[in-house]
Amino acid sequence: MNNFELILLYYGKKIFMSFVKDFKLLLKARYPIIYINTYEEERVEYVIKSAIQSFTNRAVYSWDFIEGYCNNPNDNGYAIRNPLQALEFIDKFTLETPLLVLLKDFHLFLNDISVSRKLRNLAKSLRNQSKTIVIIASDLTIPLNLSDSITILHFPLPKNSEIKKELLRIQESLGYSLPEHSLDNLVKASQGLSLEKIRRVLAKIIATYKEINVESLDLVFKEKQQLISQTQILEFYNPVTKISDIGGLNELKSWLKFRAASFSKRAEEYGLPIPKGLLLVGIQGTGKSLTAKSIANEWNLPLLKLDVGRLFGGIIGESEARVRQMIQFAETISPCILWIDEIDKAFTGSNFNNDSGTTKRVFGTFITWLSEKKSPVFVVATANNIDSLPPELLRKGRFDEVFFIGLPDLKERECIFKVHLKKIRPKSWSTYDTEILSAQSNRFSGAEIEESIYEAMHIAFNENREFTTSDILNSLKRVVPLAYTSQKNIEELEDWASAGKIRLAS
């Protein structure tokens, strides 16, 4: 087995070969400038050099701002702190051997007029030569004037097979092994981390626990939370809400239960398509967000929440880069749940006309991914105002289903009261008259029911006694439900849903 085959085995056959295949194709087609977006600088450099050795004889040089050309045999350290001189070296390279140059962190210099002009000139001349520039950068920031000259290639983070190989290697070096089930849990917990991050986390685990065990998974989750928070657009949730914690919504619950095994290997072998997602439309406080959290728990999948407001940046092109970053990260973590709360606030009709096309481009990128994605990312989007959503979002093929979550009926309200009271008073919940409470809370949302219980608790707490059914009834009388304060809007939404244009969750 040669060196390239060993690396192929180590990094995982499918993903590694996909990247190598694309990279080889770009080299053969003489693409002058390749931009590889990755945090794993050492890993991608190692993979590129090894892949090149397997099919071509090329001189490979690498440059960075501090050390210059560190492996130039004629002038080690050439072009230190001088990106323009680094490009001139490529231009003047006269050896007959084909050349590949790795420029690290070079995205930081692309807005310099001298550097960008030199790159554009090189892009023209390199098409007729066996020279290729590879920019390795953690951020995807390409000025518009270079967009035609540069080809983007994403280097994926390791998938489960790669992570497992690395964990087995580390286990072997430490001289002990985890049970298969514990190993699988650790692999799943490590999804979305680079191999270097995984090594560091394992070092921290060993320093803390003296061994790799089930309890050490918390450190992996904390590392992942920190990594996700650095994106500033995604938030990692550890879902604790169960589907049984939600009152009513029986149709929606049945739909979710029916598809609980859709991400399994058995479903894939059967030929079932990967589920795309759900759009939950309805009145505020009816449990849309709670449902999103419960799906992750029910299906035992990680939950990412997208802050749609932070997708939009002030710099031209920044918003588009952020949505691509979001997609790339979600696909790396997959299988997972991507929760997009109040999507209607981001993609309203007015936004499409007021920001020079940014919303339109971001929406276009998102909607294309939603329709064409092959990765097991299940999108759960919630919306309060159906009228403000673009019609393209509601077309068949975007989501597997669109559900309307309305105000709970009499039986559902009683169920909601029971759910909350069981959680608050697990031993004495049955002493409360949920039938009367349900009858006296007509047009209340689930959130308003919950708030009335807590209001009753506050009153009883200040009087140093246990709260009663009467306390809750008094709290209900003091609350003016949203169904009355926004009566017209809610009735229009209910009429639209009852006309058969959307599937009802109850």
UniProtKB/Swiss-Prot annotation:
A Pfam family recorded for this sequence: AAA
Q: Where are the transmembrane segments?
A: none
Q: Which GO terms describe its cellular component?
A: chloroplast
**Does the keyword Calcium feature in the UniProt annotation?**
no
Stored InterPro entries: AAA+_ATPase, AAA_domain_protein, ATPase_AAA_core, P-loop_NTPase
Q: Which GO terms describe its molecular function?
A: ATP binding; ATP hydrolysis activity
* Compartments it resides in: Plastid, Chloroplast
- Name the positions where ATP binds: G282, I283, Q284, G285, T286, G287, K288, S289
The protein's UniProt keywords, in alphabetical order, are: ATP-binding, Chloroplast, Nucleotide-binding, Plastid
Q: Which CDD domains match?
A: RecA-like_Ycf46-like (cd19507)
Stated family: Belongs to the AAA ATPase family. Highly divergent.
Q: What is this protein called?
A: Uncharacterized AAA domain-containing protein ycf46
- Its source organism is Guillardia theta (Cryptophyte)
